[in-house]
């Protein structure tokens, strides 16, 4: 796949980048070099290779997933002006 001058101008327009006519050939060469490198990467055989999330192998720290109320429910409900059985009571707003 090669990039022509019209494609360079279209990419510049989509990216909202001002490109002079003198810059188009240089950018065309740069984009073609990038695409050539991507095509070269596609030729690499990666069958059986595990995908990596990092260059350095790391294991995620795991913790027990324990459900709790935080132990401060009484303090939270205590901030409300009116409560009933650990529920906030608010004025009725819809008739």
Curated annotation (Swiss-Prot):
Keyword DNA-binding assigned: no
Keywords attached to this entry: ATP-binding, Ligase, Nucleotide-binding, Protein biosynthesis
Pfam families per record: GatC (PF02686)
EC number assigned by the record: 6.3.5.-
GO biological-process terms attached to the record: glutaminyl-tRNAGln biosynthesis via transamidation; regulation of translational fidelity; translation
InterPro entries documented for this protein: Asp/Glu-ADT_sf_sub_c, GatC
Top-level taxon of origin: Bacteria
Single GO MF descriptor: asparaginyl-tRNA synthase (glutamine-hydrolyzing) activity
Reactions performed catalytically: L-glutamyl-tRNA(Gln) + L-glutamine + ATP + H2O = L-glutaminyl-tRNA(Gln) + L-glutamate + ADP + phosphate + H(+); L-aspartyl-tRNA(Asn) + L-glutamine + ATP + H2O = L-asparaginyl-tRNA(Asn) + L-glutamate + ADP + phosphate + 2 H(+)
PANTHER family: GLUTAMYL-TRNA(GLN) AMIDOTRANSFERASE SUBUNIT C, MITOCHONDRIAL (PTHR15004:SF0)
Functional summary from the UniProt entry: Allows the formation of correctly charged Asn-tRNA(Asn) or Gln-tRNA(Gln) through the transamidation of misacylated Asp-tRNA(Asn) or Glu-tRNA(Gln) in organisms which lack either or both of asparaginyl-tRNA or glutaminyl-tRNA synthetases. The reaction takes place in the presence of glutamine and ATP through an activated phospho-Asp-tRNA(Asn) or phospho-Glu-tRNA(Gln).
Oligomer status and interactors: Heterotrimer of A, B and C subunits.
Family to which this protein belongs: Belongs to the GatC family.
HAMAP family: GatC
UniProt name for this protein: Aspartyl/glutamyl-tRNA(Asn/Gln) amidotransferase subunit C
Protein species of origin: Nitrobacter hamburgensis (strain DSM 10229 / NCIMB 13809 / X14)
């Amino acid at each position: 796949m090669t990039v022509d001058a019209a494609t360079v101008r279209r990419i510049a327009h989509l990216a909202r980048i001002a490109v002079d006519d003198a810059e188009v050939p240089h950018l065309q060469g740069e984009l073609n070099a990038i695409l050539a490198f991507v095509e070269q990467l596609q030729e690499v055989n990666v069958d059986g290779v595990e995908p990596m999330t990092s260059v350095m192998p790391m294991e995620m720290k795991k913790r027990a997933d324990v459900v709790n109320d935080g132990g401060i429910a009484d303090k939270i409900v205590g901030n409300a002006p009116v409560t009933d059985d650990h529920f906030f009571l608010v004025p009725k707003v819809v008739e």
